């Protein structure tokens, strides 16, 4: 997908808050903006 594996890791290895859609660090347990605990991994497959 990305040209460099470092860039791909930086873009895809994040967690997404299911309430406010904020990007959070991979080690997060709750959202940095709204403190919601429902986080999911960012989808690695393209949706097209």
Swiss-Prot record:
Name by which UniProt lists this protein: Large ribosomal subunit protein eL40
Keywords: Ribonucleoprotein, Ribosomal protein
GO biological process, one term: translation
PANTHER family: 50S RIBOSOMAL PROTEIN L40E, LARGE RIBOSOMAL SUBUNIT PROTEIN EL40
Similarity annotation: Belongs to the eukaryotic ribosomal protein eL40 family.
A GO molecular function held by the record: structural constituent of ribosome
Disulphide linkage map: none
Any one of the GO CC terms: ribonucleoprotein complex
Transmembrane spans: none
């Amino acid at each position: 997908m990305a040209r460099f594996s470092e860039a791909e890791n930086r873009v895809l290895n994040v967690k997404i808050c299911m309430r406010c859609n904020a990007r959070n660090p991979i080690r997060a347990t709750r959202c940095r903006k709204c403190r919601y605990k429902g986080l999911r991994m960012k989808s690695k497959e393209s949706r097209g």
